[in-house]
Amino acid sequence: MRALRVSQALVRSFSSSTRSHLENRVAEKQKLFQADNDLPVHLKGGGMDNVLYRLTMTLTLGGTAYCLYCLGWASFPHKK
């Protein structure tokens, strides 16, 4: 019985909480990303998007190069 009361209290506290502190910024983001300013869409978010893009490309290219190196190393016979 006690577990039922606890679960009801948890459900009530999560379901009835107000979200007035969060404002809807979808319209602002739509204006930003739909603006015709000759920027690629992955860079329209600002400087942090640029850093994230460069980091992602660096890790991708580094991983590809390392994978090719390991495949090349494994394809040649080794001395015993």
From Swiss-Prot:
Swiss-Prot/TrEMBL GO biological process terms: mitochondrial electron transport, cytochrome c to oxygen; mitochondrial respirasome assembly; oxidative phosphorylation; proton transmembrane transport
Give the Mitochondrial intermembrane membrane side ranges. Answer: 76-80
Membrane topology (UniProt): Single-pass membrane protein
Per the UniProt topology annotation, the Mitochondrial matrix ranges are 22-46
* Pathway per the UniProt entry: Energy metabolism; oxidative phosphorylation
- Any one GO molecular function term: oxidoreductase activity
One Pfam family in the UniProt entry? COX7a
Q: Where is the transit peptide?
A: 1-21
- Taxonomically, the superkingdom here is Eukaryota
**Sorted alphabetically, which keywords does the UniProt record give?**
Membrane, Mitochondrion, Mitochondrion inner membrane, Oxidoreductase, Transit peptide, Transmembrane, Transmembrane helix
Read off the InterPro entries from this record: COX7a (IPR039297), Cyt_c_oxidase_su7a_sf (IPR036539), Cytc_oxidase_su7a_met (IPR003177)
Gene disruption phenotype:
Mice are viable but show reduced cytochrome c oxidase activity and develop dilated cardiomyopathy and impaired skeletal muscle function. The cardiac myopathy appears at 6 weeks of age; it however improves and stabilizes by 6 months of age, due to incorporation of Cox7a2 paralog into the cardiac cytochrome c oxidase holoenzyme. Defects in skeletal muscles are characterized by reduced muscle bioenergetics and hindlimb capillarity.
Summarize the protein's role: Component of the mitochondrial respiratory complex IV (CIV, also named cytochrome c oxidase complex), the last enzyme in the mitochondrial electron transport chain which drives oxidative phosphorylation. The CIV complex is the component of the respiratory chain that catalyzes the reduction of oxygen to water. Acts as an assembly factor that specifically drives the homodimerization of CIV complexes, mediating the formation of mitochondrial respiratory supercomplexes (respirasomes) containing two CIV: supercomplxes with two molecules of CIV show improved activity.
The text of the family note is: Belongs to the cytochrome c oxidase VIIa family.
Quaternary organization = Component of the complex IV (CIV, cytochrome c oxidase), a multisubunit enzyme composed of 14 subunits. The complex is composed of a catalytic core of 3 subunits MT-CO1, MT-CO2 and MT-CO3, encoded in the mitochondrial DNA, and 11 supernumerary subunits COX4I, COX5A, COX5B, COX6A, COX6B, COX6C, COX7A, COX7B, COX7C, COX8 and NDUFA4, which are encoded in the nuclear genome.
Name of the molecule in the record = Cytochrome c oxidase subunit 7A1, mitochondrial
Species assigned in the record: Mus musculus (Mouse)
